[in-house]
Amino acid sequence: MESTTEVELSRLPDSLRGRILVTGAGVSGTGIAGMLHDLGLDVVVAEDNETSRHRLIELLDVDVVGTEHARASLGDYSIVVTSPGWRPDSPVLVDAASRGLEVIGDVELAWRLDRAGVFGVSRTWLAVTGTNGKTTTTAMLAAMMKQGGFNAVAVGNIGVPVSAALTSCDRVDVMVAELSSFQLHWAPTLVPDAGLVLNLAEDHIDWHGSFRDYALAKTRVLTAPVAVIGADDSYLVELTTELGLSGLIGFTLGEPGPRQLGVLNGHLVDNAFAAQLPLAPADGINPSGPAGVLDALAAAAVARSQGVSAEDIAGALATFEVSGHRGQVVAEDHGVQFIDNSKATNPHAADTALAGRESVIWIVGGQLKGADISELVATHAHRIKAALVLGADRAEIVTAVEQHAPDAMIRVTDSTDPVAAMRELVDHAFRFAEPGDCVLLAPAAASLDMYKGMGQRGDIFAEAVLSTIEGQKEK
């Protein structure tokens, strides 16, 4: 990799002037190592996976060692930069911390380099996090900033790695960053120019150890001078109050109070940076439904804090297209809608997907990651016509449906073949579906027990639906 932008090495933070250990040679780790290598720094990468090791060696002229070797030589390093997915209880990270070595992540590293002026004048950082809606909101906010004339790009989990945005030959002035709880855990000094927490619900408990630790990681973005939260999320409001956070901007589906954005007379309205200023019609926002309106309000709150006009917000929303697997109607056949919301990887996201539907044939299952699905099932029992269940935690889901939605039909596939399992459930869906029903893929669980990711899961669902419809036409 070659550096593509002017750098000021004299501004390099002292902690990065010694030997640096990077843990992980995946996408993030490779990006970290590449940026540090291009700066001429002394980098060693720890990775046990042989395929990842060989791929990195082909890309970069850096030393690659196993994690046990790295543990045995921690005294050689001045700092550890970890890939965000590495858990805090990983032995090499535990040992590093016990020796007093600082452990940070890719976002923290990029933040420190940018704020130190290594890549020129510091960028504006707009950080977006929460349990659900991050990607859509980040994309909306980037679109609003661009519409307002800012040189902005969406970075982080949504697409461009933060390291790539910093080193790009086309300078970026505004980084609209979708940040995960993992990245924020490893970002102890990050203070973005604006921080947004959309909502909080149980997720990644297996990684963080508790819901509270997960939530506290998310709230790190609220150290920003402009801090925005979902005012309809009672737990988030209670937590920020407990933490003594003040001066927050809120967004709500209701009429906005002081320092809030909300909905009034069918319009998104700003009552935080103006007096009940209409921004855009609530009708026609993509994605449709309450979740889309909330995402638009959240993005608008941050955009308004940066000086984007109501006209530019309306213009951005008018042309905004949602990313895949977030509520797309795959097909409509004989009065039945087939909807792909594979991105609903936890109960909170599935709750949003189920809300407002009248009669749902629900395809659900995967890895619950420690989350409890009982409340979700009980809340929507009246609309669940059938539950079609797959995945590693299928037994737990079946128990919840039997207890809390006893009138729902249940079908379970024990197949671990990703295509066969989905086709089996789609076949059941076609047999059960009647005009007015919605066949909804909203798994409420992660996909990696059977699929390469939520995208593949959604694609296979769509393929199964469309091929079944086509097959029926040929009969």
Curated annotation (Swiss-Prot):
Keyword Cell cycle assigned to the entry: answer is yes
To which protein family does this belong?
Belongs to the MurCDEF family.
Pfam families associated with the record: Mur_ligase_C, Mur_ligase_M, MurD-like_N
Q: What does this protein do?
A: Cell wall formation. Catalyzes the addition of glutamate to the nucleotide precursor UDP-N-acetylmuramoyl-L-alanine (UMA).
Q: Where is the signal peptide?
A: none
Q: Which reaction does it catalyse?
A: UDP-N-acetyl-alpha-D-muramoyl-L-alanine + D-glutamate + ATP = UDP-N-acetyl-alpha-D-muramoyl-L-alanyl-D-glutamate + ADP + phosphate + H(+)
Q: What is this protein called?
A: UDP-N-acetylmuramoylalanine--D-glutamate ligase
Q: Which GO terms describe its molecular function?
A: ATP binding; UDP-N-acetylmuramoylalanine-D-glutamate ligase activity
Keyword Cytoplasm part of the UniProt annotation: yes
Main location per UniProt?
Answer: cytoplasm
